A protein has these predicted regions:
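Catalytic-histidine neighborhood of serine endopeptidases
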Residues: 348-349
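Extracellular repeat-rich scaffold modules on cell surfaces
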Residues: 1-20, 24, 28-77, 81-88, ...
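N-terminal extracellular ligand-recognition/capping segment immediately after the signal peptide
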Residues: 20-21, 234, 241-250
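Short, solvent-exposed aromatic-acidic interface loops
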Residues: 217-221
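Structured, non-catalytic alpha/beta "coupling" segments that mediate domain-domain communication
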Residues: 224-227, 231-240
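Parallel beta-helix/beta-solenoid repeats that form elongated, surface-exposed shafts/blades used
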Residues: 26, 243-254, 282
Length: 349
């Protein structure tokens, strides 16, 4: 076990740099910063509990794993350290048995950052800084690199702040399996009128993640912001919505799921009794299915994508041809443009 003394300040740094496949099994209590990286083809695995001011995964080509342990830090940064190099990345896997708690999670510091929340692990973001700044408690792409958060069977909780998809870089939240409880998501990037990032729920034929959204909702879905809803479930922790600043061009919500579709459950995910209202201000596109279940109401206030015929060398743009199905609760559609060329099913038919 390693325990930093009183002389250690939060500006001091302890570095682990693996060149083979080392396992760090002892517990670490350190008042300063811990930096870990793995060279190409190698892996550093931590199985002991860690308490520190920060844990930063440096941007090399190897991987850092946390397994059967607890990681408790004020700052968790992935893709950090060294000089600027757009070809490098840092990768952190939270594996089975890991419980991670961080006041701030920030990806893509000085290189690409990848954070995987795998089966049997949990990540909780406890910070409450929800400002539009680099100090935000949950930021997927700080500098001009990509930050990728993959939910792969684990659990993700951030109820005091929204997930900020981008700043100078472009963030991706890819929910394939597992459960996320989020206060919200925000696509506003660093510049005025700049919106970037991607939220991907499952795929066209696979995926079973459940992402529950709170009262902050999913905001600033405009410009280069991307939402693709495939196989999986969107749930409600409160009334929430998907929205954009009307001074800018809205992005569409693309429906991908063609097997069970995207399940939208408006029954409160906590008390399992309160019907919630979920409002989509953005229009729909794609050929997938959106299936409304549970007490509560889905409101479609957006305009579905209309088809655009080919002209000259410009390819045709298909309109929305998917399906919106109401199985339980209520559905409000502003007018026929909310469904466009798509299909509306009531009670399955």
């Amino acid at each position: 076990n390693l325990k930093g003394g009183e002389s250690v300040s939060n500006g001091d740094t302890l570095t682990f740099n693996g060149t083979s496949n080392p396992t760090v099994a002892g517990n670490i209590t350190y008042a300063g910063n811990i930096v870990s990286g793995a060279q190409t083809g190698s892996t550093v695995t931590f199985t002991g509990n860690i308490q520190a001011e920060s844990f930063k995964v440096a941007h090399y080509y190897g991987r850092v794993h946390m397994a059967d342990n607890e990681l408790e830090v004020n700052k968790l940064w992935v893709g950090a350290g060294g000089g600027y190099d757009n070809s490098l990345y840092g990768a952190l896997d939270l594996d089975s048995g890991n419980v991670t708690t961080a006041g701030q999670v920030r990806l893509a510091e000085l290189g690409h950052g990848v954070l995987n929340v795998n089966q049997g692990s949990s990540l909780t973001v406890t910070g409450s800084n929800d400002t539009h700044s680099t100090s935000a408690s949950f930021l997927l792409a700080h500098w001009a690199y990509s930050g990728e958060l993959n939910l792969r069977g684990g659990s993700l909780t951030a109820l005091q702040t929204s997930m900020h998809l981008s700043w100078d870089g472009t963030g991706i939240f890819n929910a394939a399996s597992g459960t996320a409880d989020l206060q919200g998501m925000d696509f506003w990037a660093s510049g005025s009128g700049s919106f970037r990032g991607s939220f991907l729920l499952g795929g066209a034929t696979s995926g079973d993640a459940r992402v529950n959204i709170g009262s902050s909702g999913v905001t600033n879905v405009a410009g280069a912001a991307v939402i693709k809803l495939g196989e999986g479930t969107l749930g409600a922790l409160s009334n929430w919505g998907i929205s954009y600043n009307p001074n800018f061009t809205a992005s569409y919500i693309e429906l991908l799921g063609t097997v069970n579709g995207t399940i939208l459950d408006t029954l409160d995910a906590n008390d399992h009794a309160t019907g919630r209202t979920v409002t989509f201000s953005n229009g729909l596109k794609g050929d997938g299915k959106l299936v409304k279940v549970g007490d509560g109401v889905l409101v479609l206030n957006g305009t579905a994508q209309a088809p655009v015929p080919a002209e000259g060398e410009t390819a045709a743009v298909p309109g929305f041809t998917g399906t919106v199905e109401l199985r339980e609760g209520g559905l409000t559609v502003k007018d026929s443009s909310g469904i466009g060329q798509g299909s509306l099913l009531i009670g399955g038919g």
